[in-house]
Amino acid sequence: MSSSASAGKMGTPQITFFCICAVIVLGTLTASASLGPAGLTLWAIAIVLFVIPNMMIISELGTTYPAEGGIYDWIRRAFGKRMSTRAIYLYWVSNGIWMAANFILLTGVIADTFWPGMPLWVQLPLVIGFIWLTVAIINHQVEIGIGITVTGALFKIIIIGTAGIGGMVYAFHHGIATPFTAESLIPSSSSSGIGFFSAIIYNITGFELVACMGSVLKNPARTMPRAILYSSLAVVGLYIFGSLGIMMALPLDHINLVSGVTDAIRPLFGDNSPIVLIITVLFMLCIVGDQVTWSMAPSRAAAEAAREGCLPAIVGKWHPKYNTPCGASTTLGWVGTAVSILYTCFAAGDNADAFWSAFSFSSTCIISSYLLFYPAFIKLRLSDPGTSRPYRMPGGAVTAWVCTLLCVSFIAVAIVLFVFPDILSGTVNWRHSGPIVIGMIFILAVGEVIIRRSEQRHAATLTASLQETPQ
């Protein structure tokens, strides 16, 4: 479903900022920095072997098949309705889990700033409150959501710029907190935090989100490739710059997953500095912006699937006044609320553990859908060669196959490291991995039941409608 009233509201600048807001996740910037100098080498590898292929694949699909459903539409064209519904179900419902992770992070920052030692039972109502604030924003008119994503992108640039510059200034006066040597730049399975490499891969996914906003894009054939190029360059540059700043200001064993960004600027400006407080508040607002972006676009794709009878009808409900996917976004709110309660219990009093567990779980679900998304690209190249492609990946079939295999390989590695972050060192922490494995099995099983029942109900409705039609 689309809105003609809202058509053409996002040009190249808005699409660029939307992608920046969607892709840059401040909470995972610290995970990237936790890799130490070896993370810079991993970033270089990821840029060449994942970012560039990913950028070209999304540009070709987004300009060839511009539609409200985004990856749902692409996978449906390639592999059929049921497979596309499985993918978009994971893509969509996992954002309810990510919503919980995001706001666990937000309340952790609030606690660190205003109430150190705030117990989790106090943080939980705040998490739930932020979840339903996000749902209310998404259910309102689309211009508000777009405005929040643009503002969030600007705030992220300010925050990462401040952390990067602040860390470098601190290092100039006091020395570099994290030693940089030739040996430290070489990744190894024994490197501290090597499991966080999955966060680097996740950090550079999400550019395809904007394709779910098909009805509000201005001339996507022209604007989307430009915006994806600009935003890809900005995202990679900001992540590397911010990671460098954090490493220069903090030793690796002092980088906190929840408060690492604000911790990096405290040594320069002081704990009680107004600048630290301003950056902290901007950080909080960015987290809300993250969730609006990551919930708004997939909810549209899920609503499109529900419209075709592949998900429950309630998911396909659109707001009668604002034409927003209120059914899908409200469902995400309930998922996020349930997950917040569960993961607060699992955290056993540690906010950082709660964030990383929920983040790993949601990220595994989200990027699992990419295992169908990338093959859909090569399948459509083979099965639909006659469709005009305003942007076509250069290099012919060989390049298309190589890029697809590279992207699938990186996603597979990220999934393994999210679930088993210590596997490269030969150990498995089942306290971390167990809930993710069980959760994935549960979500996949529930999804299969929901999809098949939705298909049966839709078929029954169509049959009844045909029987009632006068011959």
Task: Tell where the protein language model's regions lie, with residue ranges.
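Hydrophobic transmembrane alpha-helices that form the core helical bundles
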Residues: 34, 53-131, 136-139, 284-301, ...
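TM-loop-TM module centered on a large, flexible mid-protein loop between adjacent transmembrane helices
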Residues: 73-74, 80, 112-116, 227-292, ...
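A generic transmembrane alpha-helix motif of multi-pass inner-membrane proteins
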Residues: 357, 361-369, 395-471
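Helix-loop-helix connectors at the membrane interface of multi-pass transporters/channels
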Residues: 1-4, 72-82, 103-126, 159, ...
